[in-house]
Regions:
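Short coil turns that delineate tetratricopeptide repeat
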Residues: 119, 153, 187, 232-236, ...
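Conserved structural position within tetratricopeptide repeats
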Residues: 113-116, 146-150, 180-184, 228-232, ...
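Canonical tetratricopeptide repeat
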Residues: 93, 127, 161, 195, ...
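Position-specific recognition of the canonical hydrophobic site in helix A of tetratricopeptide repeat
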Residues: 99, 133, 160, 167, ...
Length: 380
């Protein structure tokens, strides 16, 4: 099958973005990237849904390309609106949206603004450190993540990302200590176990360490056990790179095993559902026309798909409950309008009089509950 490619030039606030979506060799995957000033600033690769023929793949790519173009414009439009009344939390959430989409420089600026408004904002400090790591500034990343670690309660993910920054800096001793600390807090942290195993292989690549055969075997076995435990905790770990890494490890090809283990998981995996929830909440606050029924239905659909894959997250179920309540608000309003139309036609229609009054009471109750929930959800 010949490659399918869609390409668009998009101008936003004086910036000229090139968006390209294309199928990859083999016909099972596709990728898209966003380019600015000759530099790729965002790039992702995904699988096609099963069962698509050539025409289906083309239509799927075309629809996705159009949707990404709209999303790109809406993200930057929302970002501009936030500047009008910025708060630490809204800047952090906007930064997470940028970070999840690969706009690292824009994310960094948002996290810096959040910390400027609140110097002890833990989440902004953590995400700032992660962003610096993704930008390749490892020394600054380590400093920022250590600062986040010292700000408040111990979180496993802070130690994990700090461990990654040390690992990419070749400071294996510090990396191992961070991964062990993350696992002490959360023993089921699959990615931390995988990186701990990777660090064990890293020791085998160091020159001049004088490791004997017994120590080499011990480190290789520890790497294998940590990797297998990670795969048992999160089946997504057991991908092609994982299988290659294990094979290389068995055949004592440690350099190839090390690189393959690094490739098993991305340097940064957004927290499940955050981008979807944050975008919806920020649009509630800053959108020009607020939230309409179509956007709410799309939000419900996206969240439901995430929950289907990750049913164990209580906060996502809560957000979906809020979304259904917002959707219910549109239905109640529509009911009220229809009762009022009935009364315009026949002001003495008793059923419409009673039902209109009851629905008006329900509408006020729904509005009151939504006001409390949305303020709480957006500001915390």
């Amino acid at each position: 099958m010949d490659p399918i490619t869609f390409k668009s030039l998009i101008e936003i606030e004086g910036k000229h973005f090139i968006l390209e979506t294309a199928s990859l060799t083999g016909g099972t995957k596709y990728s898209y990237f966003i380019q600015l000033d000759g530099r790729i600033i965002s790039q992702k690769e995904s699988d096609f849904p099963d069962g698509l023929n050539n025409d289906g793949m083309k239509q799927y790519l075309q629809n996705g390309h159009k949707a990404r173009a709209v999303e790109l414009e809406s993200i930057f439009r929302l970002n501009k609106k936030i500047d009008e009344k910025a708060t630490p939390d809204t800047c952090w959430k906007m930064g997470v949206i940028f970070l999840s989409n690969g706009f690292y420089e824009d994310a960094k600026n948002r996290f810096l603004k959040a910390m400027e408004l609140d110097s002890v904002h833990l989440q902004a400090s953590k995400c700032y450190g992660i962003t610096l790591m993704l930008l390749g500034d490892l020394e600054a990343s380590i400093a920022a993540l250590n600062h986040a670690k010292d700000l408040g309660p111990s979180f496993a993910d802070i130690y994990y990302h700090l461990g990654n920054a040390y690992l990419f800096s070749k400071d294996l001793d510090q990396a191992v200590q961070c991964y062990l600390q993350a696992l002490q807090i959360n023993p089921r942290y699959a990615d931390a176990r995988l990186r701990l195993g990777t660090a064990c292989i890293g020791y085998l690549l160091q020159t001049g360490t004088g490791l004997n055969d017994a120590k080499t075997q011990e480190l290789a076995e520890r790497a294998r056990k940590e990797a297998e435990t990670a795969a048992s905790l999160n089946p997504k770990v057991r991908n092609r790179s994982f299988i290659l890494a294990v094979d290389y490890l068995k055949s004592k090809k440690y350099q190839q095993a090390y690189q393959s283990f690094l490739d098993v998981r991305p340097k940064y995996v957004p927290r499940t559902g955050d981008e979807i929830v944050f975008y919806f909440n920020l649009t509630l606050l800053y959108g020009n026309e607020g939230i309409d029924l179509q956007m709410t239905e799309q939000y419900v659909e996206k969240l439901a798909k995430v929950i289907e894959e990750y049913p164990q997250y209580a906060d996502l179920h809560h957000h979906l409950g809020v979304a259904f309540l917002i959707k219910c608000r549109f239905d109640v309003t529509r009911s009220l309008k229809e009762f009022q139309k009935a009364l315009e036609i026949n002001p003495q229609y008793k059923k419409a009089i009673v039902h209109s009054a009851d629905t008006d009471d329900l509408n006020k109750k729904v509005l009151s509950v939504l006001k409390k929930i949305i303020i709480s959800t957006v500001n915390n």
